Amino acid sequence: MENIEIVSSGKHTLHGLNFYLSYFDDVAKVLPREHYCFIVGGWVRDRILGEPVGYNIDVDFLTTADPVELAKNFAKRIGGHFFVFEKRGFLIKRPTIASVVLHLPPYRYRFDFSPLKGKDLEKALIEDLKERDFTANAIAVNLDDVLSIGAKQTIVYDPTGGIKDLEQGLLRPVSIENLKRDPVRVLRGFRIAIEKNLQLTEDFYEFVKEDPRIVLKSAVERITHELFKIMKEKTAHKVIRELYEYGVLEAIIPEIGRLREVKDQGEHHIYPLDEHTLKTLEYLEQVIEDRAKYLSAELLENFGKKRVLGEFTDVELLKWGALFHDIGKPQTFAVREGKVTFYEHDKVGAQIVREIGERLRWGDEATEFVAKLVRHHLRPFFLREAFKKGELKRRGMANFWRECGDIAPHLFLLSIADAMASGDEEEDIKALMETIAELESFNRNEMKEEIQKPLLNGDEIMEILGIKPGKIVGILKKALLEAQIDGKVETKEEAIEFIKRSTKNLKPLDEG
């Protein structure tokens, strides 16, 4: 931590350059002369901790100006995207936040502006800080001080002892009442503690144990936003494990609680279902970090570039896929002839994901992405078994790419993590890697356009055969595509002949 001097109770001094960001000059230029602006929260905390500025930059401001107008003018000046975020709840002290988001890859900036009201400026600031979540986030500096030339003695406002707590490695709630007023702060506390390597204080844990469901009093959109911020962490598995152990995750997603019902997963697993699930997420984060070791640069070209829910990506969705990949197992658990089975748990799981996504208001795009991962998470293992037997055919590989090509890198990474968390033998993991390599090679060299769709469409088939719409048309299209994949049909003329030959055997299926 930087060298901080104590001025008086609740005040310290620190060199202003510690807090500087070039965009602060732009804020100052659109701030009306008669108004003030303070930098608060995580930006101040991280600079005091001496952390480097990363690619994801979040800054919170308190201002005596109209935050909406200030944010609008700031967004216009820097070319950012402006929006207003409304917090719900009668106890929320800052219900309206004006935000500006700017993406300059690889950097992502978010600036939030909240109102500061009161005749006595310093008193209003101190009162606001005392209403915040954790002492580490209840620290502020004046924007003017940060921008002053040679600001060696910038005053740092710290009425709740946040700096002392940071020095001791603690993350302490400003008060339990503040957590009760805005319970989504519970999720934030677990995340920040892991992210910043801080120890949450005992009063926080006692509060959570007393009522893990209190988080549900917050708006579902804010819960979802905080959960996705957790998944954005490189070590999200640590936060998720704590949320699970303290009952918070189950309160939000009751389906997660059912995982502990399955103690025995059968011969292919070394952990109970809940531990296997948490381990899969843990291994996945390692695999994501080392992804270039497992997949080609070509396949990874667009990995992490799909945007969802504003500031999040397909990487977070992949982590949700890991957490939910076996969510259908409790409902499909059975013992048949002495063997544990989970028939169609992938299909059941995909439907459960859709229900969760709708409840947490993920939106269709994010929900369907995760549902598709869950629905097809077994595909790489089926293909591995075919590969081990020497039965991996063109048709199977082509079907995979045609049906799962958009999520292929995600499925591959998930399958590797799933195998590790299942305790697969080294030779089986090696076979999985070889299967993935074979699939990649096929996609790169042989997955031509003509085997991704039939050479004849439905209208053409009906015209050739002189038939009306019916099941036979779909059956013939599928048979034609499989013949193309197998290399038996390569031209349109061959396709016509194939359809004519196939009609005699298939025609009875269209009757009745």
Swiss-Prot record:
GO MF, any single term: CCACCA tRNA nucleotidyltransferase activity
Cofactor(s) of this protein: Mg(2+)
Result for mutant: D58A: Loss of activity
Listed result of changing R185A: Almost loss of activity
Annotated binding of Mg(2+), by residue: D58, D60
Entries under Pfam families matching the protein: HD, PolyA_pol, PolyA_pol_RNAbd
Mutagenesis or variant effect for F85A: Does not affect CMP incorporation
UniProt: CTP binding residues: 42-45, 132-133, 137, 182-191, 222
Record-linked SUPFAM superfamilies: Nucleotidyltransferase, Poly A polymerase C-terminal region-like
Gene Ontology biological-process entries: tRNA 3'-terminal CCA addition; tRNA surveillance
EC number: 2.7.7.-
Result of changing H377A: Does not affect CMP incorporation
Known function: tRNA nucleotidyltransferase involved in the synthesis of the tRNA CCA terminus. Adds the two cytidine residues to tRNA.
Family of this protein: Belongs to the tRNA nucleotidyltransferase/poly(A) polymerase family.
UniProt comment concerning the protein's domains: Adopts a seahorse-like shape and consists of four domains: head, neck, body, and tail.
Protein name: CC-adding tRNA nucleotidyltransferase
Organism: Aquifex aeolicus (strain VF5)
